UniProtKB/Swiss-Prot annotation:
PANTHER family tied to this protein: ATP-DEPENDENT PROTEASE SUBUNIT HSLV (PTHR32194:SF0), METALLOPROTEASE TLDD (PTHR32194)
Activity regulation, short description: The formation of the proteasomal ATPase ARC-20S proteasome complex, likely via the docking of the C-termini of ARC into the intersubunit pockets in the alpha-rings, may trigger opening of the gate for substrate entry. Interconversion between the open-gate and close-gate conformations leads to a dynamic regulation of the 20S proteasome proteolysis activity.
InterPro entries associated with the record: Ntn_hydrolases_N (IPR029055), Pept_T1A_subB (IPR000243), Proteasome_sua/b (IPR001353), Proteasome_suB-type (IPR023333), PSB_actinobac (IPR022483)
Entry-linked Pfam families: Proteasome
Gene Ontology MF, one: threonine-type endopeptidase activity
Species annotation: Thermomonospora curvata (strain ATCC 19995 / DSM 43183 / JCM 3096 / KCTC 9072 / NBRC 15933 / NCIMB 10081 / Henssen B9)
Lineage per the UniProt record: Bacteria, Bacillati, Actinomycetota, Actinomycetes, Streptosporangiales
Family in the record: Belongs to the peptidase T1B family.
Subcellular location: Cytoplasm
Protein name, entry field: Proteasome subunit beta 2
Amino acid sequence: MTERERGQGLPAEFFAVGTASFVELLSRTAPQLLPVNRVRDGSHPMPDIPHGTTIVAVRYPEGVMLAGDRRATSGNLIAQKDLEKVHRADEHSAVAMAGTVGLALEMIRLLQVELEHYEKLQSAKLSLPGKARRLGAVIRANLAHAMQGLAVVPVFAGYDLDAGVGRIYNYDITGMPQESRDFHAEGSGSPFARGALKKLYRPDLTEAEAAAVCVQALYDAAEDDAATAGPDLARRIFPTIATVTADGYRRLPEQEVAELTESVVGARRQRPDGPVAPLR
């Protein structure tokens, strides 16, 4: 260790040769900061903790789109009306969360630092499948708490610069990444959202059409799942929608999402069950 390093007062572990994983570095130097170590054990009754609900992902020719409703529930109560469930992971990937809100947000922050840490040490970016596996390792570390009901099951999506396509990855509670072919939904309203996606999805969707499909899917989920929020026109709370393309991550402007959502709500006044898929 140099005199400069000693002057900084950092432990020797910070200068030990290791892998490019920030999670492993944190495990060695400050394990108490990992999300898995910040939740009490299961020896006491678990209180109602806010849970995020429904998220969807759709592939389209230019890339991939993620969307989520804005509600978090705590037992039978609405804990938050404007929760952000879609987040940037890095320049060409994004993650949407369903499950225990506090742990999910910690995992997303950890993933963001993990990807940045790897890039700084290796002077190269991880491949998209590599990023998906890194998130899987973070989820796997939470398995003990998932078995107590504190599960986090995100959807990871991004643009594969090598293959030139958007990709969607879903996970089980053990952290195993599985690629979804065209679309995916997670959370309590996912069965209803997935049903809408099956009927409305087409491989040749434009970005505007993909956004409309996501809003329709979340609307259907909100109709049948009490934990999923529909559009709140009075409070101007609309779904969060983001895209990842060759140009990078982009969150759709709130005004654009508002106009799209209002058009969907207006159309539902004429056809409450939503658009009908053509038989072809």
